[in-house]
Amino acid sequence: VAAIYPITPSSPMAEVADDWAAHDRKNLFGQTVRIAEMQSEAGAAGAVHGSLKAGALTTTFTASQGLLLMIPNMYKIAGELLPCVFHVSARALAYHALSIFGDHSDVMACRQTGFAMLASNSVQEAEDMALVAHVATLKSSVPFLHFFDGFRTSHEIQKIDEIAYEDMAKLLPAEKVAEFRARALNPD
């Protein structure tokens, strides 16, 4: 599941995930990702929390003020040791005027939530570290905040060496995925 609320500069990530879902592109598990577009960033974080509690591997994409609205749910997710990754296109917060400059003030506001943090510096690193974050969260049950420069990296057009699903599968801790799903809340 990907719970989204498009916010610039993270919108392209959500748009790509939505496009893949619309075209029935399968993920590593042979499933189409379910996209839940919410009414706000806080709603997206709440949907991530609920989806994780139900046993679905879940992620979201956000930036700036949107990330700040997710902080209350980030505490819950970390406190309940739910494995997930928030992909953050980091940019300046609008303190008194709108700013689109890249900085890490949004990410640094989340240091105390219990999320581990992992940074990327290029488009290639963003793909590589996204995989590292997803594997690490499954192995540790510590949620991850994977961040990179907003606009510079999030909107850069660059050829990358994609990681094949076969290679990803070798890194995936299948037993940890099964343990996570077994802990899910189930009305039965």
Label for each model-derived stretch:
Residues 29-33, 144-188:
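Conformationally flexible catalytic loops at phosphate/diphosphate-handling active centers
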Residues 1-109, 114, 131-132, 150-151:
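Thiamine diphosphate
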